[in-house]
Amino acid sequence: MSQAGAQEAPIKKKRPPVKEEDLKGARGNLTKNQEIKSKTYQVMRECEQAGSTAPSVFSRARTGAETVFEKPKAGPAKSVFG
């Protein structure tokens, strides 16, 4: 006896086999020198050009020597009162 509210199990489809020659062509297309078009990357680049953020891992402005342990440059103390 079947119930009106019972659901049947979904039918799973098998993927077609992937050929090695298809993989070689796909790998070559991934690394072509294309400009990144994501909104996140675009906003990040605009912020860097405006000087409002530190150089990111995506920019080539990093030297690799930047760490959190660097001593701050000597300068006058800033006051929050003006």
UniProtKB/Swiss-Prot annotation:
This is Musculoskeletal embryonic nuclear protein 1. Belongs to the MUSTN1 family. The lineage of its organism: Eukaryota, Metazoa, Chordata, Craniata, Vertebrata. Keywords: Chondrogenesis, Cytoplasm, Myogenesis, Nucleus, Phosphoprotein, Secreted. Signal peptide: none annotated. It is found in: Nucleus; Cytoplasm; Secreted, Extracellular space. InterPro entries: MUSTN1. Pfam families: Mustang. Disulfide bonds: none annotated.
